A protein has these predicted regions:
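Glycine-rich phosphate/pyrophosphate-handling loop used in enzymes and phosphotransfer proteins
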Residues: 1-187
């Protein structure tokens, strides 16, 4: 088995650059309102709309690989207890259902503080994830709600690489505007 790879649509254009994170749109307007509703006002009914946006961005990409599993970048336990759910898990399950794929929890987050409210430098030192070793190498799609610096999704990808993933693609519903983000691309 060779070294872990990113999918063609997630491969950075410059050699040695960090893994590219795709987002279906920028965090503005209606999308921002929907995500805030999901995260802070228990509006789980918006999951279907947000999942449709993610699936549309996948299907519009002619280079998207054939994924075998969908997972999510888990939110902190503090936030999950406050909300009663993990919004990224809900999104991942909805995306998997629309794509006819299995959704499994592959990642476990350390007990780090939530990213919300942290400044850019603090976010760059994002959470640490662990993943159980895979029985066989899978092509994994990792879903998250918002990408700001990319540290959360890159940490998730690193854990999956170490667990034996064949390919890891990273997709968020929305990215903060480029001037506040790092190495993310709106699909």
């Amino acid at each position: 088995m060779g070294s872990p790879r990113t999918c063609p649509s997630c491969t950075p254009s410059s050699v040695g650059a960090d893994r590219l994170i795709r987002a279906s749109t920028e965090l503005r307007g209606e999308t921002q309102d929907l995500i805030r509703g999901l995260k802070y006002r228990n509006q789980r009914n918006v999951v279907a709309d947000l999942a449709d946006r993610l699936v549309s961005s996948i299907l519009a990409d002619p280079h998207a690989p054939t994924f075998e599993l969908v997972t999510w970048a888990p939110t902190s336990m503090v936030r999950q207890r406050q909300r009663g759910y993990d919004q990224s898990e809900l999104l991942a399950k909805a995306v998997a259902g629309r794509l006819g794929l299995r959704c499994r929890r592959l990642l476990y987050r350390d007990r780090s503080a939530p990213q919300t409210g942290r400044n850019r430098q603090e976010r760059l030192n994002g959470p640490v994830f662990r993943a159980r070793p895979m029985r066989r190498p899978y092509r994994v799609l990792v879903i998250d709600d918002v990408v700001t610096t990319g540290s959360t999704l890159r940490a998730a990808a690193h854990a999956l690489d170490l667990a034996g993933a064949k390919e890891v693609c990273l997709l968020a519903v929305a990215a903060t505007p480029r001037d506040r983000s790092t190495n993310s691309r709106v699909a």
